[in-house]
């Protein structure tokens, strides 16, 4: 079977895959390489640092370790277990200064501008900075602390100034422009031509063409935005850490044993022994709202979660949102654009906000119509069983689960017994073998340092030739200081322009650890997310590009490959071989599989509406004049105009919408998940129609060749047409979600 499954009423958010700082590097064209730094004795420095005093010597050694070339096996690996925060600020400042010196050498080159001495030379800059950003990203996302957040706040404006200094270097841009407009470009390979185009656009669209006065204002805006966006993200994290609901044993009604065990462990970590903690994260909130029979507590947990950043205190984000929107609008106005979204989408697949809105609005009516049907089913059960008069937002998941059992005799918790985290990982390796010819071998000799004991590492090889491809790091479990959600990133990307570089990729999740000695069981939705993020890792590992910048992504395309990989979770090969009961070891019964298939489009009204509401509000925020905007009022009025069902809230309310306000990664681009899903649904049909189904070798080879290995070396629209022979069709998406498909006359 192959179906798009939805076994829980809300899908875990696919988090921002490149961490903010990696995206920052891409935008500055610093994903390349750089200054040679003196190689230090890493182990000696580490041993000295671990003695840890606050002396200047310790700071200098910490700085040297952060700047050091990576040593050890696999072309060198990060020393995650040895670096400390002590020297982060001076190391970052030194690396930025070195990078600016490299840029000045290129800008002041007396020779005529060429592809090699300008574009390729830029690709070679920033190696020290790249390494430091890898560590910075770990401290930001995987092991944040109050100490780091102070450093982050200090560095944000400095990083912004650094970026602006490069982007506003007139001599550098003149050289880039000269290459861009030269006859030389015409004889370059298509990939090299695209590198020139991406480099030119990254400057011309980011203030390089402005006069000196406007450049100064542009840089000042960026500096302030960096501060505001950092503050926004830290405020949300503060509310996630501060709000916890503690339960007594008598308040556990309806909760499966696995959830009770996780809640008990969370309470123990917070010195509330004998109680049960529901933390203010999606991974804790979601199952509680699905199963708890305590309606009052459901409301409390729901309010805590959807009020993050919106509590009228020091961590309230509404004023920050208003200022961010105003500054973004002013900044693109300097470039001549009517609004932020028009600027942002110009180089995306959608090309314009109007095209993105048209896609979303074509799906919206079917989504809210389905919500009406879902609510009617839920209310009937709620009245009959509990005497409720209306379904509230904190009831939706709870009664949706009851409807699922009533309509399909399908229990999400029963399915969960077959979803063991370790088995799912092996299933992903199986898919990688069949589609990519990859072989994953765990590195167990301690030769690859990790930043937490939960992290494990695998070497990736070509199964046929044995050629080394890279490493895959996995950090699966939730813990204090780790950002919520799930994401993928790279510590080093594939390139060949200075000798073949291997890939250091990672997947990061927030699964709740099982009880000691017991396997970790996860929901189907979380299993889809697991496969999704692994799809990003495969995209990194399959890269065949020559230059660092060609590893960058197009936002409304970059989720396509990862969304597509979710489909292999529900293939017969995976279900029959890897989805086995955690106690009996028996495979999932055919009767249960049949129920899953029948319920494939269940609750699509909820999942589509909560997502689209966020995407549409994001787009509306970035297409209006934000002067004097009240974000809370704007959100309410926008949803009212959309006729948003009152039983559903946006997946991300504005004060906690980190995708668009803690960085610019998804600003006016949250629609990109649906844009990519059109491609996903259409590509899935190519496999479904092939003789070998989802493991058809010919289709798989085309997938890897045209959609994974090329990264951003080929325009995404051209790449998809090379795979499919035509553009993707939205009708495939509508079929996937069980929505009516309009027949063409």
Regions found by a protein language model. Give the residues of each.
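Short His/Asp/Glu-rich catalytic/ion-coordination signatures at enzyme active sites or charged loops
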Residues: 72-87, 136-155, 179-220, 279-319, ...
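Short, Lys/Arg-enriched N-terminal segments with co-localized hydrophobic residues
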Residues: 1-15
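Sec-dependent signal peptide recognition
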Residues: 17-24
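Active-site-proximal, well-structured secondary-structure segments within enzyme catalytic domains
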Residues: 191, 195, 224-227, 234-279, ...
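N-terminal helix-rich structural modules
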Residues: 44-257, 261, 693-695, 745
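Short pre-active-site segment immediately N-terminal to the catalytic Zn-binding motif
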Residues: 512-530
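C-terminal, non-catalytic "cap/extension" segments appended to globular domains
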Residues: 48-83, 87, 94, 275-277, ...
């Amino acid at each position: 079977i192959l179906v798009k499954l939805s076994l829980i009423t809300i899908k875990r958010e696919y988090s921002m895959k490149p961490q903010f700082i990696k995206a920052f590097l891409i935008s500055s064209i610093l994903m390349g390489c750089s200054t040679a730094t003196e190689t230090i004795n890493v182990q000696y420095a580490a041993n000295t640092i671990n003695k840890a005093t606050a002396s200047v010597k310790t700071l200098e050694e910490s700085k040297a370790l952060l700047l050091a070339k990576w040593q050890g096996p696999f072309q060198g690996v990060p020393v995650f277990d040895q670096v400390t925060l002590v020297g982060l600020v001076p190391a970052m400042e030194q690396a930025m200064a070195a990078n600016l010196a490299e840029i000045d050498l290129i800008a002041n080159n007396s020779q005529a501008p060429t592809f090699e001495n300008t574009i390729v030379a830029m690709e070679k800059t920033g190696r020290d900075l790249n390494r430091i950003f890898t560590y910075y990203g770990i401290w930001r996302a995987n092991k944040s602390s109050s100490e780091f957040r102070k450093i982050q706040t200090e560095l944000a404006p400095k990083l912004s100034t650094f970026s602006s200094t490069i982007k506003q270097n007139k001599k550098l841009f003149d050289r880039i422009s000269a290459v861009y407009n030269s006859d030389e470009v015409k004889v370059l390979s298509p990939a090299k031509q695209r590198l020139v185009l991406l480099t030119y656009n990254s400057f011309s669209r980011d203030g390089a063409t402005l006069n000196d006065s406007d450049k100064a204002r542009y840089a000042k805006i960026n500096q302030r935005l960096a501060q505001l966006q950092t503050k926004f993200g830290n405020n949300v994290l503060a509310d996630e850490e501060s709000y916890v609901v503690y339960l007594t044993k008598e308040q556990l009604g309806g909760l499966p044993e696995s959830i009770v065990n996780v809640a008990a462990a969370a309470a123990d970590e917070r010195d509330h022994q004998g109680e049960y903690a529901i933390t203010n994260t999606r991974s804790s909130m979601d199952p509680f709202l699905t199963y708890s029979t305590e309606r009052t507590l459901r409301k409390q947990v729901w309010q805590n979660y959807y009020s993050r950043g919106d509590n009228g205190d020091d961590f309230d984000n509404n004023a920050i949102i208003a200022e961010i929107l105003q500054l973004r609008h002013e900044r693109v106005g300097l470039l001549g654009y009517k609004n932020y979204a028009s600027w942002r989408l110009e180089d995306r697949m959608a090309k314009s906000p109007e095209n993105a809105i048209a896609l979303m609005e074509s799906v919206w009516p079917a989504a809210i119509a389905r919500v009406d049907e879902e609510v009617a089913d839920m209310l009937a059960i709620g009245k009959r069983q509990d005497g409720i008069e209306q379904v509230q937002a904190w009831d939706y998941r709870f009664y949706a689960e009851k409807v699922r059992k009533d309509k399909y005799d399908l229990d999400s918790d029963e399915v969960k017994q077959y979803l063991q985290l370790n088995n799912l990982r092996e299933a992903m390796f199986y898919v990688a073998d069949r589609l990519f010819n990859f072989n994953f071998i765990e590195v167990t000799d301690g030769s690859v340092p990790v930043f937490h004991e939960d992290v494990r590492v695998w070497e990736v090889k070509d199964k046929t030739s044995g050629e080394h491809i890279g490493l895959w790091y996995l950090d699966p479990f939730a813990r204090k200081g780790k950002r919520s959600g799930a994401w993928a990133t790279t510590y080093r990307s594939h390139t060949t322009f200075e000798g073949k570089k291997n890939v250091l990729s990672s997947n990061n999740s927030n699964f709740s650890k099982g009880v000691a000695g017991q396997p970790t069981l996860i929901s189907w939705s979380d299993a889809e997310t697991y496969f999704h993020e692994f799809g990003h890792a495969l995209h990194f590992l399959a890269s065949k590009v020559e230059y660092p910048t060609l590893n960058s992504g197009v936002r409304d395309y970059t989720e396509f490959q990862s969304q597509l990989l979710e489909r292999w979770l529900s293939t017969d090969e995976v279900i029959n071989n890897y989805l086995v009961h955690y106690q009996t070891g028996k495979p999932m019964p055919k009767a249960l599989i049949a129920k899953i298939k029948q319920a494939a489009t269940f609750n699509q009204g909820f999942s589509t509406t909560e997502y689209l509401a966020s995407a549409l509000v994001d787009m509306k925020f970035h297409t209006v004049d934000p002067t004097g905007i009240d974000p809370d009022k704007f959100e309410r009025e926008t949803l009212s105009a959309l006729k948003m069902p009152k039983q559903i809230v946006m997946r991300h309310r504005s004060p906690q919408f980190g995708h668009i306000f803690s960085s610019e990664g998804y600003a006016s681009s949250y629609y990109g998940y649906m844009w990519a899903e059109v491609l996903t649904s259409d590509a899935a049909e190519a496999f479904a129609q092939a003789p070998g189904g989802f493991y058809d070798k010919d289709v798989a080879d085309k997938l890897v060749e045209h959609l994974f290995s090329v990264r951003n070396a080929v325009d995404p629209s051209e790449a998809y047409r090379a795979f499919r022979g035509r553009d993707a069709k939205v009708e495939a998406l509508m079929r996937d979600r069980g929505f009516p498909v309009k027949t063409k006359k």
